[in-house]
C-alpha cells in the first residue's frame, strides 16, 4: 500500500469541510426565508382602511353616500343640454 501524503489529506478534508459548511448555511437561510413568508401570510399586512385611500378619502362608508334625487338629475340635464325630456313647471 502506498502512503497518501498528509497535505493531500488536508486538502480533501478541507474541501469536504467547506462543502458541508456551505450546505448547512444555505439550508438555514432557506429555512429562515420560508418561515418569514409563512409569518407574513398570517398577518394582515396589506389590509388598509378604504376611507384613507385615494378616491375614498373622507368617506368612511360607501353605503352612506347620498344618491341623487330625480330633481337633481333633471336640473343637471338642463345644464348639460341633454336631450332628455324634462318637465318644466312654469
Swiss-Prot record:
Pyrrolidone carboxylic acid: modified positions: 49
Pfam families documented for this protein: Bombesin (PF02044)
Q: Which residues form the propeptide?
A: 31-48, 61-90
Q: Which residues form the signal peptide?
A: 1-30
GO cellular component: a single term: extracellular region
What protein family does this chain belong to?
Belongs to the bombesin/neuromedin-B/ranatensin family.
| Protein name according to UniProt | [Phe8]-phyllolitorin
Q: Which organism is it from?
A: Phyllomedusa sauvagei
Per the UniProt record, the lineage of the source organism begins with: Eukaryota, Metazoa, Chordata, Craniata, Vertebrata
